[in-house]
Amino acid sequence: MKRLVILGGGESGVGTAILGKQKGWEVFLSDKGSLKPHYRETLNKEGIQWEEGTHTEEKIL
């Protein structure tokens, strides 16, 4: 399975994550700051793994 890592959990990052998931990619989104609550809910609903407050090197490389 192809893997897509997205840095940044704003509108375009979350949109890209959803599109990648729909296209069959394994998606991981990482944001150094904090995600807006409705973006967290959307990512959880779509089954997309994510983190906030850090960029964990082992997860993004």
Give residue ranges: language-model regions.
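N-terminal leader/targeting and accessory segments in enzymes
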Residues: 1-61
